[in-house]
Amino acid sequence: MTQDQFARYSFLLDRTARKVKQYAQQQFKSGDFDVTVDQWLVLKNLSENGHLSQTELANLVFKDHPTLTRILDLLCKKGYVERVPHPLDRRSFQLHLTNTGVSKVTALRPRILEIRKKAWENLADQDFEEFKRILDTIYQNLGGQELE
């Protein structure tokens, strides 16, 4: 691959990732979701994984600790997330969804699925599989673990 091709493909990848996030943020804002995209990622991961430490959650949502702390503070204030003492380590805590948080995830999940479908609406299954294969290869080239 030439330097120009590499620059062009890198630009396209970055531009597309930014557009997907921008579109999602616009939909969240105009759709009265009461959470941001980043807050949703936290809620979704807590919903799928149960009790997590802040470090475990940070790794899942790719956020540093100060950023995640701010997000968690807001979600706790809204009543969606609760910090509970860790059963084995009194110095730390675990995070979990409250009943209100579970209800929020249940209510938002179908709406968010519709937002995600927008990006893929004109792609065939074969396009999607090839795209996934290429992204997985790039991710692994940079030291990431393969995801299912």
Would you name each region that the model predicts?
Residues 9, 38-39, 100:
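N-terminal positioning helix adjacent to the helix-turn-helix/winged-helix DNA-binding module
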Residues 54:
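Helix-turn-helix DNA-binding elements, focusing on the entry/boundary residues of the two helices
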